[in-house]
Regions:
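Short beta-alpha connecting loops at secondary-structure transitions
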Residues: 22, 61-67, 100, 126, ...
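Active-site lining segments that contact anionic ligands and/or coordinate catalytic metals
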Residues: 6, 32, 52, 111, ...
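Glycine-rich, flexible loop segments associated with nucleotide phosphate handling
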Residues: 2-6, 94-102, 171-176
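FAD-binding core of flavoproteins
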Residues: 1-85, 206-227
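Extended amphipathic alpha-helical segments enriched in small hydrophobics
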Residues: 68-129, 133-152
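Short acidic (Asp/Glu) and glycine-rich catalytic loops that position anionic groups and cofactors
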Residues: 16, 55-62, 81, 116-120, ...
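Residue-level signature of the cytosolic catalytic core of signaling kinases
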Residues: 50-51, 96, 171, 187
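Alpha-helix capping/hinge segments and adjacent helical runs
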Residues: 136-227
Length: 227
Protein backbone atom coordinates (compact mmCIF):
# COMPACT_ATOMS: atom_id res chain seq x y z
CA UNK A 1 0.00 0.00 0.00
CA UNK A 2 2.86 2.39 0.78
CA UNK A 3 4.33 2.07 -2.68
CA UNK A 4 1.22 2.88 -4.72
CA UNK A 5 1.20 6.23 -6.44
CA UNK A 6 4.98 6.61 -6.55
CA UNK A 7 6.40 7.68 -9.91
CA UNK A 8 10.09 8.17 -10.72
CA UNK A 9 11.63 10.93 -12.84
CA UNK A 10 15.21 11.72 -13.80
CA UNK A 11 16.50 15.27 -13.54
CA UNK A 12 19.01 17.23 -15.59
CA UNK A 13 21.22 18.67 -12.84
CA UNK A 14 21.89 21.69 -15.06
CA UNK A 15 18.21 22.65 -14.94
CA UNK A 16 17.29 26.14 -13.80
CA UNK A 17 16.66 26.30 -10.06
CA UNK A 18 18.99 23.41 -9.15
CA UNK A 19 21.77 24.34 -6.70
CA UNK A 20 24.54 21.88 -5.76
CA UNK A 21 26.73 22.36 -2.68
CA UNK A 22 29.57 19.85 -2.12
CA UNK A 23 29.79 18.43 1.41
CA UNK A 24 33.31 18.41 2.84
CA UNK A 25 33.95 15.05 4.48
CA UNK A 26 36.25 14.10 7.35
CA UNK A 27 38.74 12.52 4.93
CA UNK A 28 39.03 15.75 2.93
CA UNK A 29 37.01 14.53 -0.07
CA UNK A 30 33.65 15.78 -1.30
CA UNK A 31 31.92 12.64 -2.55
CA UNK A 32 28.43 13.85 -1.62
CA UNK A 33 26.44 17.02 -2.19
CA UNK A 34 23.53 18.98 -0.81
CA UNK A 35 21.04 19.59 -3.62
CA UNK A 36 18.49 22.41 -3.41
CA UNK A 37 15.49 22.82 -5.73
CA UNK A 38 13.88 26.22 -6.24
CA UNK A 39 10.70 26.13 -8.36
CA UNK A 40 12.15 23.31 -10.48
CA UNK A 41 9.72 21.74 -12.94
CA UNK A 42 10.31 18.30 -14.44
CA UNK A 43 8.50 17.42 -17.70
CA UNK A 44 6.73 14.11 -18.20
CA UNK A 45 9.29 13.31 -20.91
CA UNK A 46 11.74 12.70 -18.04
CA UNK A 47 9.58 10.06 -16.38
CA UNK A 48 11.12 6.62 -15.84
CA UNK A 49 8.64 3.79 -16.23
CA UNK A 50 4.89 4.02 -15.93
CA UNK A 51 2.85 6.25 -13.67
CA UNK A 52 2.65 4.54 -10.28
CA UNK A 53 5.58 2.22 -11.05
CA UNK A 54 8.17 4.29 -9.19
CA UNK A 55 8.83 1.69 -6.50
CA UNK A 56 9.47 -1.01 -9.11
CA UNK A 57 11.90 1.29 -10.93
CA UNK A 58 13.64 2.17 -7.65
CA UNK A 59 14.11 -1.50 -6.73
CA UNK A 60 15.50 -2.30 -10.18
CA UNK A 61 17.90 0.64 -9.85
CA UNK A 62 19.02 -0.50 -6.38
CA UNK A 63 19.60 -4.08 -7.54
CA UNK A 64 21.76 -2.84 -10.41
CA UNK A 65 23.62 -0.53 -8.02
CA UNK A 66 24.34 -3.37 -5.60
CA UNK A 67 25.58 -5.51 -8.47
CA UNK A 68 27.85 -2.69 -9.64
CA UNK A 69 29.23 -2.01 -6.15
CA UNK A 70 29.74 -5.67 -5.28
CA UNK A 71 31.38 -6.52 -8.60
CA UNK A 72 33.09 -3.23 -9.34
CA UNK A 73 34.92 -2.12 -6.21
CA UNK A 74 38.42 -3.26 -5.34
CA UNK A 75 38.29 -5.19 -2.09
CA UNK A 76 42.00 -4.63 -1.62
CA UNK A 77 43.04 -8.28 -1.97
CA UNK A 78 45.69 -7.65 -4.68
CA UNK A 79 47.10 -4.83 -2.54
CA UNK A 80 47.31 -6.86 0.69
CA UNK A 81 48.85 -9.81 -1.16
CA UNK A 82 51.51 -7.56 -2.74
CA UNK A 83 52.17 -5.95 0.64
CA UNK A 84 52.61 -9.32 2.36
CA UNK A 85 55.06 -10.43 -0.33
CA UNK A 86 57.32 -7.40 0.16
CA UNK A 87 56.88 -6.38 3.82
CA UNK A 88 59.65 -7.60 6.16
CA UNK A 89 58.74 -8.74 9.68
CA UNK A 90 61.01 -9.78 12.55
CA UNK A 91 60.48 -13.43 11.59
CA UNK A 92 60.97 -12.89 7.84
CA UNK A 93 58.64 -11.80 5.04
CA UNK A 94 55.02 -11.22 6.06
CA UNK A 95 53.86 -13.74 3.45
CA UNK A 96 55.69 -16.51 5.36
CA UNK A 97 53.89 -15.81 8.65
CA UNK A 98 51.19 -18.48 9.30
CA UNK A 99 48.68 -15.92 10.65
CA UNK A 100 49.12 -13.72 7.58
CA UNK A 101 48.81 -16.70 5.22
CA UNK A 102 45.61 -17.79 6.96
CA UNK A 103 44.08 -14.34 6.43
CA UNK A 104 45.17 -14.29 2.78
CA UNK A 105 43.69 -17.75 2.17
CA UNK A 106 40.34 -16.65 3.60
CA UNK A 107 40.27 -13.49 1.50
CA UNK A 108 41.35 -15.39 -1.62
CA UNK A 109 38.40 -17.76 -1.21
CA UNK A 110 36.01 -14.83 -0.76
CA UNK A 111 37.50 -13.07 -3.81
CA UNK A 112 36.93 -16.18 -5.91
CA UNK A 113 33.35 -16.37 -4.67
CA UNK A 114 32.75 -12.72 -5.53
CA UNK A 115 34.21 -13.23 -9.00
CA UNK A 116 31.98 -16.23 -9.73
CA UNK A 117 28.88 -14.56 -8.28
CA UNK A 118 29.56 -11.52 -10.45
CA UNK A 119 30.03 -13.72 -13.52
CA UNK A 120 26.64 -15.38 -12.96
CA UNK A 121 25.01 -11.97 -12.58
CA UNK A 122 26.62 -10.62 -15.76
CA UNK A 123 25.53 -13.74 -17.64
CA UNK A 124 21.95 -13.10 -16.51
CA UNK A 125 22.19 -9.45 -17.57
CA UNK A 126 23.44 -10.45 -21.01
CA UNK A 127 20.22 -12.44 -21.43
CA UNK A 128 18.10 -9.41 -20.54
CA UNK A 129 17.29 -10.57 -17.02
CA UNK A 130 16.94 -8.10 -14.12
CA UNK A 131 19.44 -8.51 -11.25
CA UNK A 132 17.79 -10.33 -8.36
CA UNK A 133 18.11 -10.15 -4.58
CA UNK A 134 20.98 -12.67 -4.63
CA UNK A 135 23.25 -9.87 -5.87
CA UNK A 136 23.04 -8.36 -2.39
CA UNK A 137 25.51 -11.09 -1.34
CA UNK A 138 28.33 -9.63 -3.44
CA UNK A 139 27.88 -6.12 -2.11
CA UNK A 140 27.63 -7.33 1.50
CA UNK A 141 30.77 -9.48 1.29
CA UNK A 142 32.82 -6.96 -0.72
CA UNK A 143 32.14 -4.07 1.66
CA UNK A 144 33.08 -6.00 4.79
CA UNK A 145 36.11 -7.54 3.12
CA UNK A 146 37.40 -4.14 1.97
CA UNK A 147 37.23 -2.76 5.50
CA UNK A 148 38.81 -5.84 7.10
CA UNK A 149 41.71 -5.87 4.63
CA UNK A 150 42.41 -2.16 5.08
CA UNK A 151 42.48 -2.50 8.89
CA UNK A 152 44.73 -5.56 8.74
CA UNK A 153 47.10 -3.89 6.26
CA UNK A 154 47.51 -0.86 8.51
CA UNK A 155 48.17 -3.04 11.56
CA UNK A 156 50.67 -5.12 9.60
CA UNK A 157 52.69 -2.05 8.62
CA UNK A 158 52.93 -0.61 12.11
CA UNK A 159 53.96 3.06 12.09
CA UNK A 160 54.45 2.90 8.33
CA UNK A 161 50.70 2.57 7.95
CA UNK A 162 50.24 6.14 9.18
CA UNK A 163 51.69 7.61 5.98
CA UNK A 164 48.97 9.31 3.91
CA UNK A 165 51.07 11.17 1.33
CA UNK A 166 51.16 9.22 -1.99
CA UNK A 167 54.33 11.10 -2.95
CA UNK A 168 56.13 9.45 -0.01
CA UNK A 169 54.55 5.99 -0.04
CA UNK A 170 51.91 5.30 -2.68
CA UNK A 171 50.76 1.90 -1.42
CA UNK A 172 50.37 3.08 2.19
CA UNK A 173 48.37 6.10 1.02
CA UNK A 174 46.10 3.83 -1.05
CA UNK A 175 45.39 1.65 1.97
CA UNK A 176 44.64 4.71 4.11
CA UNK A 177 42.20 5.93 1.44
CA UNK A 178 40.61 2.48 1.25
CA UNK A 179 40.06 2.42 5.01
CA UNK A 180 38.46 5.88 4.97
CA UNK A 181 36.22 4.90 2.04
CA UNK A 182 35.14 1.48 3.30
CA UNK A 183 32.43 2.59 5.80
CA UNK A 184 30.56 4.33 2.97
CA UNK A 185 30.62 1.14 0.89
CA UNK A 186 28.79 -0.65 3.71
CA UNK A 187 26.06 2.01 3.70
CA UNK A 188 25.53 3.11 0.08
CA UNK A 189 23.19 0.97 -1.97
CA UNK A 190 21.76 -0.58 1.20
CA UNK A 191 23.30 -1.06 4.65
CA UNK A 192 24.69 -4.41 5.77
CA UNK A 193 21.61 -4.92 7.97
CA UNK A 194 19.19 -4.27 5.10
CA UNK A 195 21.12 -6.63 2.80
CA UNK A 196 21.14 -9.40 5.41
CA UNK A 197 17.37 -9.13 5.69
CA UNK A 198 17.01 -9.26 1.89
CA UNK A 199 19.24 -12.34 1.65
CA UNK A 200 17.46 -14.06 4.55
CA UNK A 201 13.93 -13.39 3.31
CA UNK A 202 14.19 -13.35 -0.49
CA UNK A 203 17.08 -15.72 -1.15
CA UNK A 204 16.95 -18.20 1.75
CA UNK A 205 13.18 -17.97 2.26
CA UNK A 206 13.38 -17.34 6.01
CA UNK A 207 10.43 -15.73 7.86
CA UNK A 208 10.14 -11.96 7.57
CA UNK A 209 10.77 -9.59 10.45
CA UNK A 210 7.74 -8.70 12.59
CA UNK A 211 6.32 -5.40 11.31
CA UNK A 212 3.39 -3.54 12.80
CA UNK A 213 3.03 -1.38 9.67
CA UNK A 214 2.89 -4.18 7.11
CA UNK A 215 0.05 -3.72 4.63
CA UNK A 216 -0.80 -0.24 5.92
CA UNK A 217 -0.48 3.04 4.07
CA UNK A 218 1.71 5.67 5.71
CA UNK A 219 -1.32 7.73 6.78
CA UNK A 220 -2.80 4.65 8.50
CA UNK A 221 0.22 3.85 10.69
CA UNK A 222 -0.53 4.67 14.36
CA UNK A 223 1.62 7.47 15.78
CA UNK A 224 1.83 9.32 19.08
CA UNK A 225 -0.13 12.18 17.51
CA UNK A 226 -2.98 9.91 16.43
CA UNK A 227 -3.74 8.78 19.99
Amino acid sequence: AKHRGLTMFFLDMRSEGVEIRPIKQANGDSGFNEVFFTDVRIPDSQRLGGVGDGWKVALTTLMNERLAIGGGISTGFPEIKALAETLPLASGQAIDDPAVRSKLADWYAKSAGLKNTGARAMSALSKGEIPGPENSIGKLVAGGMMQDIAKFALDLQGLGGLITDPEIARSQAQIQAMLMRSPAVRIEGGTDQILRNIIAERVLGLPEDMRADKGLAFNQIPTSESK
